[in-house]
Amino acid sequence: MGKMKDKDVDAEKYEKAQRSPKLCGTNYPVSIAFIVVNEFCERFSYYGMKAVLTLYFMNYLHWDKNLSTAIYHAFSGLCYFTPLLGALIADSWLGKFKTIIYLSIVYVIGHVVKSVGAIPDVGDSTVHIALSMVGLGLIALGTGGIKPCVAAFGGDQFDEDNIDERRKFFSIFYMSINAGSVLSTIITPILRGDVQCFGGDCYALAFGVPAALMVIALVVFISGSGLYKKSPPEGNVLVRVCKCIGFAISNRWTNSKKSPKRSHWLDWAEEKYSKRLIQEIKMVCRVLVLYIPLPMFWALFDQQGSRWTLQATRMNMDFGGGFIIKPDQMQMLNALLILVFIPIFDMGIYPLVGLCRIKLTPLKKMATGMILAALAFCAATAVEVYVIKTVVEPPPAKESLVQVYNLMDSDVTVQFPAHNVFSEPLKPYEEPSGYSSLPLTGESQLQNVVVSHNGMNYQCRLTFTERMAYSLLLHPTAQHNGSVCNLVKDHITKSETGAAYIRFINTHTENINVTVGTEEVHASANYGISRNISVPRGEYNKAVCVTDTKEYEINLGLLDFGAFYTVILSEAGNNLAVKKMEDIQANNIHIGWQIPQYVFLTAGEVMFSITGLEFSYSQAPASMKSVLQAGWLMTVAFGNVIVLIVAEGAGMEQWVEFLLFAALLVAVSIIFSIMAYFYTYVDPDQLDKLFKEDGDGGKVESSKKDELSLGDMPKQTKM
């Protein structure tokens, strides 16, 4: 009686849902508007936070590029492992609606914790790291947990006779994802770089706005609560699949010697599970085997937000007319291009290839997508080869780098013991030709450097440390009767935001305070040298210099992306003479050269990712599609694990690493093509013709019970 009552209640709720209002006189239920807005805000929240994450690790937490890349991909991988947990909770316990709400709350808490961790005044660096990691963990649980629920929940809102509307809904849903991605990757880098807070880039705001968007997403979703169809949990098919496989393995292990041999190892589950379920799992396993090479594609694809962003920081970002793009904004190209490429491929390229009588099967498209992604990394390699020409690499063990500034009134000669580093005389106030390598006998070495000037030799005892860069300043004594050696440690690592570095040498007899933009530095009198300051790229025509008695206005000109400048300030009558020298070359490779690699990678994504999902769904029974979705998400997760391992373990130059990934993907695409050649397409819908459902839950009819196998399924061509 109780069960009958429950059924009546469920039926009543269902009828009520059926009568829910439609959107603007269409067959679309009003409820999907809340779901689409929720998805837009959630994707804005996720991609906005992720866009600035690598630079946050490097500039705020002060991690090196390899650790930053590793943690970035560890987080990305975790975001694709947690959907399994979300699907399990939704299907077995809470249902999709409650799962989305509860995990969205976890998501919001993660964003808030992450934003608080980006406030400099909250604790020390250990607290910032702890809050950041806790926040990212909660975000990964939230975004991954709701990932398998939201789209499926949206599909549940449609009646069975509104198939076209449901299909169009998924297109709208996908558009909302890309719209959120594009806008967030434009806006959050602006919040990071153009808004200053706590004396630097405003990461707290860049993370806080995505947090606010996630709060809006949650509020919008809850607001539509009374309009949704809410299906109760039906049990997780992935759990049943795992139990069936586990039973087959254990039963085979226990009884293989006692019982007759069976045609397939899964047939050992027949004692407990239906023939139909076993047959469906066999079909799924055939597809999952093809998934084995796929993580390598995602290993390349997900480096847009890590290695490619770091490459962009070392490039010229000026498009002219005052339009300067930020390195973390380049990721928006992927979302923009995919919106352009999908119709181009569907309505242009694929039909044209068909006219050439070339049959593009899904597996051929996926293999082609892999090759395109490999070409993207070949393009990235070519760009990197030119980019590194503007970079001064830190010296290896038992080596230092040194450059010399001759601030004397005539030529000088510098001699290092046993090393002919500077063979030619150095002219006064001449710009150094660059850093020279100085071999050392150990981790550090005291060297007697001989400086020759006007026929006199002066000996300087200087200590050099391995892996460090130095500037040796040679200037006259206060009485101008000799030479003084001043060895200064140099900062040679380029800014990860593309900013310029500048320092000042004061040859004036008075102390000087210099203001460049919002930065102020002090240079002591008589050849004092200021600290390095970082300033945004731009024209600085009115820098202010204040001495003990006067105030001067100097023209520093353009301080370009990634350059290191040394400016010598000298007294010249009633003015200050300015000599600007470029210690490290500006970023002269334009960021536009990254566009080809984004084009190749996005084209590869269209052919690989979209086609891969289409292929997977076409080759599995309806009841097993969630299992394949879980398997697909796992390939993304393992792809990020590959990058994590390479970033932390390989220790190779960046262009070599790019080339390695390209070569690995080419090799994997060949393996995948061979596997695809031997794969035979089947029609899962034919299962309904081979099986007759009865009260037992899918037993095969007796005439086919013994001989049914995948061989009975209708086949199509290979590859």
Swiss-Prot record:
GO cellular component: apical plasma membrane; phagocytic vesicle membrane; plasma membrane
CDD domains, per database record: MFS_SLC15A1_2_like
Residues exposed to the Extracellular side: 62-69, 121-125, 191-201, 302-334, 389-594, 648-657
Disulphide-bridged cysteine pairs: none
PROSITE patterns assigned to the protein according to its UniProt record, in alphabetical order: PTR2_1
Tissue and organ distribution: Expressed in kidney, brain and gut. Also expressed weakly in eye, gill and skeletal muscle.
Cytoplasmic compartment residues: 1-43, 91-99, 147-169, 223-280, 356-367, 616-626, 679-719
Membrane topology: Multi-pass membrane protein
pH dependence: Optimum pH is 7.5.
Any Gene Ontology biological process: tripeptide import across plasma membrane
Known glycosylation sites: 66, 481, 513, 532
Residue span of region Extracellular domain (ECD): 389-594
Location within or outside the cell: Apical cell membrane; Cytoplasmic vesicle, Phagosome membrane; Cell membrane
Keyword Cell membrane: yes
Reactions that this protein is recorded to catalyse: a dipeptide(out) + 2 H(+)(out) = a dipeptide(in) + 2 H(+)(in); N-acetyl-D-muramoyl-L-alanyl-D-isoglutamine(out) + 3 H(+)(out) = N-acetyl-D-muramoyl-L-alanyl-D-isoglutamine(in) + 3 H(+)(in); glycyl-L-leucine(out) + 2 H(+)(out) = glycyl-L-leucine(in) + 2 H(+)(in); glycyl-L-lysine(out) + 2 H(+)(out) = glycyl-L-lysine(in) + 2 H(+)(in)
Keyword vocabulary terms for this entry: Cell membrane, Cytoplasmic vesicle, Glycoprotein, Immunity, Innate immunity, Membrane, Peptide transport, Protein transport, Symport, Transmembrane, Transmembrane helix, Transport
TM region(s), chain numbering: 44-61, 70-90, 100-120, 126-146, 170-190, 202-222, 281-301, 335-355, 368-388, 595-615, 627-647, 658-678
Single Gene Ontology MF annotation: peptide:proton symporter activity
One Pfam family here: PTR2
Biased composition (Basic and acidic residues): 695-708
Region (Disordered): 695-719
InterPro entries: MFS_trans_sf, POT_fam, PTR2_symporter_CS
Family: Belongs to the major facilitator superfamily. Proton-dependent oligopeptide transporter (POT/PTR) (TC 2.A.17) family.
Known function: Proton-coupled amino-acid transporter that transports oligopeptides of 2 to 4 amino acids with a preference for dipeptides. Transports neutral and anionic dipeptides with a proton to peptide stoichiometry of 2:1 or 3:1.
Name listed for the protein in its UniProt record: Solute carrier family 15 member 2
Organism, as annotated: Danio rerio
Gene: slc15a2
